[in-house]
Regions:
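Conserved N-proximal alpha/beta basic substrate-recognition cap immediately N-terminal to
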Residues: 1-65, 71-72
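Short arginine-rich
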Residues: 64, 97-98, 296-298, 326-344
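Internal nucleotide-binding/catalytic subdomain
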Residues: 76-212
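Flexible, glycine/charged-enriched surface loops at secondary-structure junctions
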Residues: 101-105, 175-186, 230-241, 331-345
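Short, well-ordered beta-strand elements within core beta-sheets of diverse protein domains
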Residues: 151-155, 306-314
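Active-site "cap" helix and flanking loop/linker of ATP-utilizing ligase/carboxylase catalytic domains
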Residues: 163-183, 191, 201-284
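Short, well-ordered alpha-helical segments
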Residues: 310-332
Length: 367
């Protein structure tokens, strides 16, 4: 529907239909990388589980990662240990009819996962490039179900080796489709320093966009409109941001009625808090206990299982992580079993030296 407004000349800063296809049709997105001269990991698209099982059985020496195509449930993404658990999961999804859309199997590549993105307009990419590291599992230590993104560490930089290899070569293609807005490429970087793109995100990711606000300066409307008109006026803070997702049961599933996780007060949270380093999601205005014990005191309450993201900023990854968790402990008082990973950022202590030996993010420090 937005495309008709674009054609009428309305200033719309965001993904168009062709850009969305890059993300949602993984096989098509992989072909775009290849056309830009960027090597990709082999993948195959399936509609039938039996066909996917046959591929795995014919290649028992390989590990595979399964991913839904389009808007499929992220919980159906699975990284196998060997052929046996991949076949088991495919049979399980087939039996339960968990997903009736298309999905892909992609060969597993070992390495460090890192993403790079940028804001794109008529004048090309902003000079401020965003490097980021996602934490995708529900529980600390990367255990539990995949949620898409449970927390993220990021920083803006004007010199990114990863961007030079997998993002900037796409500039001509983006101009060709009339793209505007944010675009992100998630990669596996192997021990030789080769980046292997996994997927496009042709929109501000969630909660990535919320965490970005901790680094942005000024009114976003101004620099977004300027980007549409070919000017780069985005201003950002130096330093690193860390964001942590705060959820409640039955996240990441949707097996309970909305009313069962709605209406729980978030005590003492002010609107001032919610416009700085606390980024609200599924909440609304409601009531908590007043002095007389009745629920008559206006306050912010939950309105779903994905409640908020808390961000922090610092000169190092550790500083940003501590800032985010300190804010969570001081400002967030929830009562319905809040779920928060307590290790967002920590894996970078081991990952950064591996990346830096191959020339990536050399000026990023863990401590």
């Amino acid at each position: 529907k937005l495309e008709s407004y674009r054609r009428k000349g309305y200033p719309i800063y965001g993904c168009n239909v062709e850009g969305a296809r890059w993300e949602q049709d993984r096989e098509y997105g992989s072909a775009i990388f290849e056309r830009a001269g960027i090597a990709t990991i082999p993948m195959q698209k399936f509609k039938k589980y039996d066909d996917a099982i046959a591929l795995v059985l014919a290649n028992k020496n390989k590990r595979y990662v399964s991913k839904p195509v389009g808007d499929g449930d992220k919980a159906l993404s699975y990284c196998s240990k060997d052929w046996r658990d991949m076949v088991f999961m495919l049979n399980k999804w087939k039996k339960s009819n968990a997903y009736d859309g298309e999905f892909v199997l992609q060969e597993f590549h070992k390495g460090c996962e890192m993403a790079v993105g940028g804001w794109f307009g008529l004048g090309g990419f902003s000079k401020h490039i965003l490097e980021n590291w996602e934490f995708k599992k529900l529980m600390s230590g990367d255990h539990g179900p995949a949620t898409g993104e449970q927390g993220t560490v990021m920083r803006y930089t004007q010199k990114s080796l990863l961007a030079e290899k997998v993002l900037l070569p796409l500039e001509g293609f983006l101009h060709g489709i009339g793209y505007s807005g944010y675009i992100d490429v998630n990669c596996i970087i192997d021990d030789k320093g080769n980046p292997w793109p996994l997927e496009f995100t042709t929109r501000p990711g969630w909660p990535l966009f919320q965490i970005q606000q901790a680094l942005h300066l000024g009114c976003p409307v101004g620099w977004m409109l300027d980007s549409l008109n070919g000017k780069d006026t985005l201003k950002v803070k130096d330093g690193i941001a860390c964001g942590i997702v705060v959820s409640q049961p039955d996240y990441p599933y949707n097996n309970v009625k909305k009313k069962e996780n709605t209406g729980y007060p978030i005590f003492d949270l002010t609107m001032e808090d919610a416009t700085s380093n606390i980024h609200l999601s599924e909440v609304k205005m409601g009531f908590g206990p007043g002095k007389d014990g009745r629920n008559t005191e206006p306050c912010i309450v939950t309105a779903g299982s994905y409640v908020m993201t808390v961000s922090g900023v610092g000169k190092t990854v550790h500083d940003a992580k501590c800032d985010a968790y300190d804010t969570y402990k001081k400002k967030v008082c929830m009562i319905n079993s809040p779920m928060v990973r307590d290790d967002i950022g920590e894996k970078l202590e081991e990952m950064l030296p591996l990346l830096q030996k191959n020339g990536y993010c050399k000026d990023v420090k863990y401590k």
